[in-house]
Amino acid sequence: MEKRKIILDCDPGHDDAIAIMMAAKHPAIDLLGITIVAGNQTLDKTLINGLNVCQKLEINVPVYAGMPQPIMRQQIVADNIHGETGLDGPVFEPLTRQAESTHAVKYIIDTLMASDGDITLVPVGPLSNIAVAMRMQPAILPKIREIVLMGGAYGTGNFTPSAEFNIFADPEAARVVFTSGVPLVMMGLDLTNQTVCTPDVIARMERAGGPAGEMFSDIMNFTLKTQFENYGLAGGPVHDATCIGYLINPDGIKTQEMYVEVDVNSGPCYGRTVCDELGVLGKPANTKVGITIDTDWFWGLVEECVRGYIKTH
């Protein structure tokens, strides 16, 4: 099996933690590095959360801090979902794990420039790090094999009626990425909301056990409450983990090629991913957009990754 080389760019975040857990353990993925961006919470908090997850699960992958602010807009956070720390719920041991000194954007540029064009970028937060890397060094564009991202929606948003949080947090960055010409795969809310993590799924991961089962339970029990309070959902979707699922086996997720444009005009549609589902604009498709996911397969995959952390001495 070919191992997909990836850089995971994230803003941990409850579902980000699940994505890290899966990407670091599954044999189909070669996780080269984790880059952190501000998003669900401010950068100082998302960085600590990423380091905590890596320390708890003994994930020995370098972690790099990136953009603390969006490119243009005033910063927003998703504390209504992720809490004051950005990863409320689990209790971690005192943190000894440290981030690398290199800036995430420099790491992304240097790693891509030294590569053979075989690295996939997996941004599951606001696209600030990726967009700044593209603007700082446009020569990286042909080096990117593919960008598999979590963000947007072809239907309704979740932070405004039009916009999904990751895109709304930095629409200008998203505009840079969606006009880059790099092959894009978008896991938007229409798909990711199919991965609602109900109490029976949490119980299944608890039964699977080990440090990842425990962390999954602590994390997803917290979002049970916030997702119901905010959106009336029966649990928290693991939005970001769908990108890892797609990379492991794209057959589990049905996609449709569409032309996608990010609205950066101020107004009620600011941050909307305008997806030309019917092809009415006549513009060539630039994105594979996730439509449906085989949830039985997906939760089986999550459980497989959880079990991978159980120590056998």
Curated annotation (Swiss-Prot):
GO terms for molecular function: calcium ion binding; purine nucleosidase activity; uridine nucleosidase activity. The keyword Cytoplasm does not apply. It catalyses: a pyrimidine ribonucleoside + H2O = a pyrimidine nucleobase + D-ribose. It is an enzyme of class 3 (hydrolase). Its cofactor is Ca(2+). Its EC number is 3.2.2.8. It comes from the Bacteria. Homotetramer. Hydrolyzes cytidine or uridine to ribose and cytosine or uracil, respectively. Has a clear preference for cytidine over uridine. Strictly specific for ribonucleosides. Belongs to the IUNH family. RihB subfamily. PANTHER family: INOSINE-URIDINE PREFERRING NUCLEOSIDE HYDROLASE, URIDINE NUCLEOSIDASE. This is Pyrimidine-specific ribonucleoside hydrolase RihB. It comes from Shigella sonnei (strain Ss046). The gene is rihB.
